[in-house]
């Protein structure tokens, strides 16, 4: 129910979700990846089973049929049940062992990794929640539970509904990964995402933690790179804020004028 990155490969999406499978593959390729582990989809299923939520989800989805409003109403109930659920002792112990192996009271990111991410015909990335700068077992378990609940947010459910994805098939893993105190962060697309140009890469970057870029909260800088020539097109965004560490997670702060452009 809990796996090290090195034991996961890119084909293991059903076990580790999209992000988890990619982190595992990068680790196997000796790429420098911040340390961590994956609470697998089996752990999510066991959590649902122990808290008697599995049958509730199946029954309510069957009742809702293909009516979006009914599915959303059911999902609201699923979230409440998940948030009030408890972790089985064996799973809690496994998570605790892996967390302690990272170092004493390490600050970590708790990252959702759903099985419906990065499909060929739809992008589910960003539909589930992730949390930064989390510390201590109680907080980790609380935020894993929040990741589980985020599988059933209105946004995630509606997106799956409109993509024609079977709600009963979706599952989620959670990544627990050591935090990196980044002054600047970004996202790299190895294929230009708008025009699907395989000869170009796109980087979106901003100051602070990557949450501001991923969430679209800031107008990030963009760098378009031609793979063949190395030529770069740069567009500097008006970055008004940045997300940085806080004692209890993260906080959004105004960026100084000299860094905005």
Task: State each model region's role.
Residues 121-122, 187, 213-215:
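Short conserved micro-motifs at the rims of enzyme active sites and ligand-binding pockets
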Residues 1-175, 184, 255-258:
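N-terminal beta-alpha lobe that positions the nucleotide/phosphoryl donor
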Residues 114, 178-180, 207:
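Short, flexible loop/turn elements at secondary-structure junctions
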Residues 131-135, 189-192, 224-226:
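Short beta-strand-to-turn element immediately C-terminal to the catalytic PLP-Schiff-base lysine
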Residues 200-261:
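Conserved catalytic alpha/beta cores of large enzymes that bind or transform nucleotide phosphates
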Residues 123-125, 190, 203:
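Short, glycine/charged-enriched secondary-structure capping and boundary segments
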């Amino acid at each position: 129910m809990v796996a090290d990155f090195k034991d996961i490969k890119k084909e293991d999406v059903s076990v580790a979700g999209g992000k988890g499978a990619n982190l595992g593959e990068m680790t196997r390729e000796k790429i420098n990846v911040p340390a961590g582990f994956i609470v697998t989809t089996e752990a999510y299923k066991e959590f649902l089973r122990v808290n008697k939520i599995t049958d509730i989800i199946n029954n309510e989805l069957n009742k809702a049929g293909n009516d979006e409003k009914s599915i959303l109403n059911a999902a609201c109930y699923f979230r409440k049940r998940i948030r009030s659920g408890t972790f089985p002792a064996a799973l809690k112990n496994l998570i605790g062992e892996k967390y302690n192996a990272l170092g004493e009271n390490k600050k970590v990111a708790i990252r959702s990794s759903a099985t419906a991410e990065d499909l060929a015909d739809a992008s589910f990335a960003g539909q589930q929640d992730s949390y930064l700068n989390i510390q201590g077992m109680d907080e980790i378990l609380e935020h894993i539970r929040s990741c589980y609940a985020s599988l059933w947010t209105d946004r995630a459910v509606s997106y799956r509904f409109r993509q024609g994805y079977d709600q009963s098939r979706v599952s989620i893993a959670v990544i627990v990964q050591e935090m990196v105190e980044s002054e600047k962060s970004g996202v790299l697309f190895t294929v230009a995402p708008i025009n699907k140009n395989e000869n170009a890469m796109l980087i979106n970057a901003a100051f602070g933690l990557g949450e501001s870029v991923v969430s679209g909260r800031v107008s990030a800088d963009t760098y378009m790179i031609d793979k063949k020539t190395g030529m770069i097109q740069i567009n500097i965004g008006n970055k008004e804020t940045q997300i940085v560490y806080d004692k209890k997670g993260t906080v959004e702060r105004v960026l100084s004028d000299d860094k905005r452009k």
